[in-house]
UniProtKB/Swiss-Prot annotation:
UniProt pathway annotation: Amino-acid biosynthesis; L-tryptophan biosynthesis; L-tryptophan from chorismate: step 5/5
Domain of life: Bacteria
E.C. number: 4.2.1.20
Pfam family, one: Trp_syntA
Subunit structure: Tetramer of two alpha and two beta chains.
Entry protein name: Tryptophan synthase alpha chain
Family: Belongs to the TrpA family.
Length: 258
């Protein structure tokens, strides 16, 4: 469990497909059912979003999913309980994507205890600057839960090295300057940026934000160790187009076999 479980998802040259689901969108039973589906479909890690009223890094699709969850009365406590229940059925690593405010409102120690009970292996906090990591990083290290760092296109290489020097799990490389969401084209500068990150960090590098098509996945996966697909997965789940999610997962698996 924990950091080692995330590392295992990348062992022996494995490429990771990491779908994002919003916790509580459609209800907590739906969250458990979606995690079971993604596990059976062959996803490597599942990223579970914690709904928040001011999601500054999220694009419109994820914002709407978070609002649906909050409007239905979903709580962080309820999400943890759902994860505790589904954890007994699946082995797929869990990574939570949460803003800092819900963690502090819940209580840091209580949050981490709940992560341990629910079998959470890592967390991503997009609005936690590197300079303020000590708010939660030492507690996570003791619990063997990875604090996944985010690096961006605009990050100088010295900062990327600094941010990732003591990190665990994988590096989340944000492939756009802006919020999440579906995008049509990735420029050559993104390829150059990802190659630069790969060269200077000691962890697997996962590309995320705006990846939505098989072609984008195939392009990213030749440079990176994995991809996060968020807005597109939420759209496909909402519209019950699960076979298309399976096709995206297969796009990653096929690159391993090539």
């Amino acid at each position: 469990m924990g950091v080692e479980k995330i590392i295992a998802a990348f062992e022996n040259g494995k490429k990771a497909f990491i779908p994002y689901v919003m916790g509580g969108d459609g209800g907590l039973e739906k969250l458990k059912e979606r995690i079971r589906f993604l596990d059976e479909a062959g996803a490597s890690i599942v990223e579970i979003g914690i709904p928040f009223s001011d999601p500054v890094a999220d694009g419109p699709t994820i914002q709407r999913a978070g609002k649906r969850a909050l409007d239905s009365g979903v709580t962080l406590k309820g999400i943890f309980q759902a994860l505790i229940e589904v954890r007994q059925e699946v082995q797929i690593p869990f990574v939570l994507m949460t803003y800092l405010n819900p963690v502090l409102a819940f209580g840091k120690e209580r949050f981490i205890e709940s992560c341990l009970e629910a079998g959470v292996d890592g967390i991503i906090v997009p609005d936690l600057p590197y300079e303020e990591q000590d708010i939660i990083a030492p507690l996570l290290r003791v619990a063997n839960i990875a604090l996944i760092p985010l690096v961006t296109v605009t990050s100088p290489i010295e900062r990327i090295e600094k941010i990732t020097s003591e990190s665990q799990g994988f590096v989340y490389a944000v492939t756009v300057a802006g919020v999440t969401g579906v995008r049509q084209n990735f420029k050559d500068e993104i390829r150059s940026y990802l190659e630069k990150v790969k060269e200077h960090v000691h962890l697997p590098v996962v590309a995320g934000f705006g990846i939505s098509t098989r072609e984008q996945i195939e392009e990213m996966i030749t440079i990176c160790d994995g991809v996060v697909v968020g807005s597109k997965v939420i759209e496909l789940l909402e519209n019950e187009k699960r076979e298309e999610i399976c096709e995206l997962i297969h796009a990653v698996k096929e690159t391993e076999e090539a």
